[in-house]
């Protein structure tokens, strides 16, 4: 809630820190993020609305044009599409591998590889993958 139009203008002008709009800043989400960070011993946390958003944010934070990702072949279709199509258009290449074959994973790693992505219970096949 804004006290007056000057207060609203200051918030939207970013000269006064605080909540502006629920999609940009949200006091409930802020409390959750701070508590998760404290529980995990971290500096900060980010809560997003879906697993797909979390995956996209993480990969885009780690990789940029010219970089590479190694990913499990049997992953959720939306994630496969992100890696195979969306990120390819941004210049991030992905090699899909059988993560149960460690040699195949190792062979896929390149100098530009920024992450190895796997799902411990890969959708749609429900194959269990141990990250160890």
For each feature predicted by the language model, list its residue ranges.
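Conserved PLP-anchoring active-site segment centered on the Schiff-base-forming lysine
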Residues: 61-79, 97-98
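Buried hydrophobic positions in well-ordered alpha/beta secondary-structure cores of metabolic enzymes
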Residues: 36, 54, 69, 116-119
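CheY-like receiver
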Residues: 35, 58, 104-108
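Conserved small/polar residues in nucleotide/adenosyl-binding loops
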Residues: 128-132
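Short, surface-exposed connector motifs at secondary-structure boundaries
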Residues: 39-42, 63-68, 88, 114-115
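PLP-dependent aminotransferase-class I/II
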Residues: 81-126
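Conserved N-terminal alpha-helix of the aminotransferase class I/II PLP-enzyme fold
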Residues: 4-56, 78-85
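Glycine- and other small-residue-rich loops at beta-strand/loop junctions that grip anionic moieties
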Residues: 21-22, 47-48, 72-73, 94-97, ...
């Amino acid at each position: 809630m804004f006290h007056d139009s000057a207060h609203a203008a200051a918030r939207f002008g970013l000269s006064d820190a605080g909540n502006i709009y629920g999609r940009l800043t949200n006091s409930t989400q802020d409390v959750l993020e701070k508590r998760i960070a404290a529980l995990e011993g971290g500096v900060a946390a980010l809560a997003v609305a879906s697993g797909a958003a979390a995956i996209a944010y993480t990969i885009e934070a780690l990789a940029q044009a010219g970089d590479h990702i190694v990913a499990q072949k049997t992953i959720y279709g939306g994630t496969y599409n992100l890696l195979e199509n969306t990120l390819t258009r941004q210049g991030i290449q992905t090699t899909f591998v059988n993560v149960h074959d460690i040699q195949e994973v190792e062979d896929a790693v390149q100098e530009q590889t920024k992450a190895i992505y796997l799902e411990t219970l890969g959708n749609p096949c429900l194959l269990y993958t141990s990250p160890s």
